[in-house]
Amino acid sequence: MTITVDIEIEDEAWTTAEADAEALVWRAAQAVLDAHEDIEGQGIVILLTDDDSVQALNRDFRKKDYATNVLSFPSPPNPEGQIGDIALAYGVCAREAAEQGKPLAHHLQHLVAHGVLHLLGYDHERDDEAEAMEALEREILAGLDVPDPYASDEEGR
């Protein structure tokens, strides 16, 4: 089954910083979907937006009044087969990439993969869940030539 990935760019800062942001997002989302051929559903919407918009979503839906890098909103079962929506905040993502010394393109692809995995039911609340999700992220990102995003985290443990 083909799953549509619709990408909406609300904040042009994304394409100013990464001219091929839309293609990067699509490739990362598609890599996750390709690794899960048994998915039931029709579509995912990914919104590249600003910090204020993500803060409003986080406040309204999670009761947390701050911007975060990525939010995932799995859809309840629906006749359209929508899997869910993802929103990414440019300012937070760009700041994190700079602080972590990695290209924004790599961080963007990591967060898209992370968000899509959440839509598919993966979580990281417990250590065993986090390890499984991170392992899958590493595998997917390696296929996109994105270095292990958790490598520096583990060196510090």
From Swiss-Prot:
Pfam families reported for this sequence: YbeY
EC number: 3.1.-.-
The protein's required cofactors: Zn(2+)
Residues binding Zn(2+), per UniProt: H114, H118, H124
GO biological process, one term: rRNA processing
Claim: Cytoplasm is one of the keywords in the record: yes
Tagged with keyword rRNA processing: yes
UniProt similarity note: Belongs to the endoribonuclease YbeY family.
Role description: Single strand-specific metallo-endoribonuclease involved in late-stage 70S ribosome quality control and in maturation of the 3' terminus of the 16S rRNA.
The protein's name in its UniProt record: Endoribonuclease YbeY
